[in-house]
Amino acid sequence: YDHTIERKYQALIWGIPNKEKGTININLGRSFKDRRIIDAFANNTLGKKAITHYKVIEQYHYISLIECELETGRTHQIRAHMKYIGHPIFNDKTYGGDKVVKGNKFTNYKKFVENNFKLMPRQGLHAKSLGFVHPTTNQKVLFESELPEDFLGVIDRWKKYNTSKNY
């Protein structure tokens, strides 16, 4: 893998990680049960090296907005790593984030979560930036992308939900 390529993503994940910043250094490889899924191999003897650095940007009680920087670029790396640490990506059907993972399962809250799934009917993962050194000019090139409307809409709803509840 090429360390000169800088990849940053933003993700909505279930729950709040124990640490505000962290590094997940766990090998990843195809699942033995379903080849479409990537599994984390904690013993690091199977799969390929995969390193994800993350930091929490904001917390909304049951979900968090994080930024991830990839040191390696494995298939489904962020999705598999977040599932491995118990914080699957919001509305990620493949890796278990498409149901109420954190919080109670009672009617009003469950409806609130399901409405957010409808507002953003995809996983809560966004490619924020891609940077590299141009091969002929040797200049650093950086492409950035703002969070899309559906993603921002879900964040806004969680902020409002957060302030409307007394914990």
Short names for language-model regions:
Residues Y1-Y167:
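RNA pseudouridine synthases
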